[in-house]
């Protein structure tokens, strides 16, 4: 969990800025993920310069120019990434050894190529959001703890109502996050096999997705688009604007 991060039009700064393009993936989404290679979840990425990777290098200067200029992209070194492998070794994300490890055991042809992007390489929308109450409701339905990281949200809300899935009622509305950022809630978030994978162990538990499909039409959380950029911090307030 990040203490703070910049949310821009293309998503959360630094989110999913690296991916491995696979020759065996479908053309619509040509990147390898844990749906294909579950062991990817056992590799722990860490920015070499966490502070520089949390916000654009000229954020303060850009925001000081009315009405607010889009900040510059980070320099490559700002986003340098190291990866802790399951064996305990630490390798740079661009080390060919890492590409080789991630390709082990894959069925069929998967030639992997590292990609770095200045925008988040998200599946669908720039920002995903889910409430802690929704996670707790799913826990109650399953009768066991559920790691919130299964849902891979950019933003976790603690709703005053205390009701699970209440964020679905925000679709079509705008939210003020913190003092400046403004997002439009676009649609419910359709879920796939990823929520059935334990983010700590990589173990597959199909009952998680089955329950969300049975009880909630396979939706959990919502997708958002950023209307006004800004920095978010843990504990920031959330206001429904309209």
Description of each model-found segment:
Residues 1-178, 182-191, 196-197, 231, ...:
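Electropositive, beta-rich accessory/interaction domains or terminal extensions
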Residues 192-229:
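A conserved acidic, glycine/proline-rich C-terminal tail/linker
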């Amino acid at each position: 969990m990040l203490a703070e991060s910049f949310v821009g039009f293309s998503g959360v700064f630094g989110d999913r800025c690296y991916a491995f393009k696979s020759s065996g993936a479908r053309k619509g989404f040509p990147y390898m993920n844990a749906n294909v290679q579950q062991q990817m979840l056992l590799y722990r990425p860490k920015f070499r310069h966490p502070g520089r990777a949390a916000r654009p290098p000229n954020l303060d200067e850009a925001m000081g120019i009315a009405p607010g200029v889009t900040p510059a992209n980070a320099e490559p070194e700002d986003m340098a990434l190291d990866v802790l492998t399951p064996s305990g070794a630490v390798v740079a994300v661009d080390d060919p050894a890492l590409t080789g490890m991630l390709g082990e055991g894959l069925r069929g042809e998967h030639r992997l190529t590292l990609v770095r992007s200045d925008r988040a390489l998200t599946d669908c929308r720039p920002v995903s959001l889910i409430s802690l109450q929704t996670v707790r409701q799913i826990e109650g339905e399953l009768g066991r703890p559920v790691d919130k990281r299964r849902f891979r949200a950019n933003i976790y809300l603690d709703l005053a109502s205390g009701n699970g899935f209440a964020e679905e009622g925000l679709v079509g509305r705008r939210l003020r996050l913190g003092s400046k950022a403004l997002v439009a809630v676009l649609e419910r978030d359709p879920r796939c096999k990823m929520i059935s994978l334990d983010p700590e162990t990589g173990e597959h538990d199909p009952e998680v997705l089955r329950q969300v499909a049975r009880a909630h039409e396979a939706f959990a959380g919502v997708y958002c688009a950023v209307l006004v950029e800004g920095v978010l911090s843990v504990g920031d307030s959330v206001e429904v604007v309209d």
